[in-house]
Design a protein with these regions (language model features):
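Alpha/propeptide regions of enzymes that mature by internal proteolysis
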Residues: 1-155
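Conserved small/polar residues in nucleotide/adenosyl-binding loops
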Residues: 156-163
């Protein structure tokens, strides 16, 4: 199971990512942030090269997040197994959740954020993350952590497909 959120503070322009996974070394493979450019989370049969590639397209070629994501996914194989979320320095978002992502999976864009997850108890986990981010006042880190807490609460209150 992996769930993540990329977000931006509209007041400061600060970018950030919060991610949790059952996979080892998730922090070395999945979250990518470049100050003044954007944030990218790659997960589910992840290809770590996608993060820097998308950030390079945002920065060097001045592509919008959707175009950068499409180009990066188009140049790599196995995209249907991946989940990728992107936010740029202007707060524009893009997301991809391949049909072959593991278990119940979902990806949702919100105001200044985008979240995704796989092997979930249900799609409501990601929806709750976005709602928590949007409804929590304060600094970006507080909003990212509120989103993670919302997901964790649902993990322990929602029936899991593996429980049957």
């Amino acid at each position: 199971m992996t769930f993540s959120i990329v977000g931006r503070c509209a007041e400061t322009g600060q970018l950030g990512i919060a991610i949790s996974s059952s996979s080892i070394a998730v922090g070395a493979r999945c979250p990518w942030v470049r100050a003044g450019v954007g944030a990218v989370a790659t997960q589910n049969v992840t290809l770590p090269a996608l993060g820097p590639q998308i950030l390079d397209l945002l920065e060097g070629q001045k592509l919008d997040p959707a175009s950068a994501l499409d180009r990066a996914l188009g140049s790599n194989g196995w995209s249907q197994y991946r989940q990728v979320t992107v936010i740029d320095s202007q707060g524009r978002t893009a997301l991809f959740s391949g049909q072959e992502a593991l278990g119940q999976h979902n990806a949702v864009a919100g105001e200044q954020c985008v979240a995704a997850g796989n092997l979930l108890a249900g799609p409501q986990v990601i929806e709750a993350m976005v709602q928590a981010f949007e409804n929590t006042p304060g600094m970006l880190v507080e909003r990212l952590l509120a989103a993670m807490q919302a997901a964790i609460c649902l993990l322990y209150t929602s029936p899991s497909p593996r429980d049957s």
